[in-house]
Amino acid sequence: MSPSCSSCVNVLLIMCLMLLSLSADAYKNYTVGESTGWFDIQERPSANYQKWADSKSFSLGDFLIFNTDSNHSVVQTYDFKTYKDCDYDNNENNDTTEWSAANPSATSPVPVSISVPLVKEGSNYFFSGNYDGEQCKFGQHFMINVTHGQGLPDSSSPDDAAAPGPSESSQSGDDEVAPDTIVPANFDHPKDIESADDDKEVHSKKSSSSTTKTSLFCFVFMGLFASF
């Protein structure tokens, strides 16, 4: 192979590696607590959400999926004092969102799944504010650090995310009823929750197809140049 061809191969190889790296980027969904769900330690003694969170890496555009019931709430804040006090009622900085309001009066709690987008870098704090912070004080809390990663999707910004409350099923007394899924308004979810595994790296089918095509392109060109 001539020196010029060898240089071309090296350039193409570098370009292919860069393309593969870019196409491999994908937003992630993290199921909080995995099979434990989102409950205080009085209900789930094995729950250790901070330990779970410390084993993950979070970036902008990722989602946290809270599988819980209508008797537990999901509160997100950027204020450490609010988090430490397990109390969001007196928060005055407009930096706290109650994604799911609990319903303590319900005689038969219904399963609920809440999808929370990560739209701000830095420290993000989560807890259940139900029963005057009692659930939070009994282990239902954790903090994470969100990095920039590949940034937010083009169609989203921190102001796009609404904070809807849980919608109860019409069969509230049926323990086997499928959980409702609450997705923030005007925010493109990176994957279909129902068809994906816990903590599985995901992106759209278009991205997956693009990765495959890029890989094939690289292998074909490398094979062609290797034959010379």
UniProtKB/Swiss-Prot annotation:
Organism (species): Arabidopsis thaliana (Mouse-ear cress)
Phytocyanin domain segment(s): 28-148
Biological role: May act as a carbohydrate transporter.
Region span, Disordered: 148-211
Lipid-bearing positions (GPI-anchor amidated serine): S204
Coiled coil regions in record: none
Biased composition (Basic and acidic residues): 188-204
Keywords: Cell membrane, Disulfide bond, Glycoprotein, GPI-anchor, Lipoprotein, Membrane, Signal
Propeptide span(s): 205-228
Membrane topology field: Lipid-anchor; GPI-anchor
Domain of life: Eukaryota
Identification of the protein by name: Early nodulin-like protein 18
Ranges of biased composition (kind: Low complexity): 153-170
Family listed: Belongs to the early nodulin-like (ENODL) family.
Gene Ontology MF terms: electron transfer activity
Any single Gene Ontology cellular-component annotation: side of membrane
InterPro entries registered for this protein in UniProt: Cupredoxin, Phytocyanin-like, Phytocyanin_dom
PROSITE patterns linked to this entry: PHYTOCYANIN
Disulfide-bonded cysteines: C86-C136
Intracellular or extracellular location(s): Cell membrane
Positions bearing carbohydrate: N29, N71, N94, N145
Classification via PANTHER family: BLUE COPPER PROTEIN, EARLY NODULIN-LIKE PROTEIN 18
Tissue expr: Mostly expressed in seedlings, roots and flowers, and, to a lower extent, in leaves, stems and seeds.
Signal peptide: 1-26
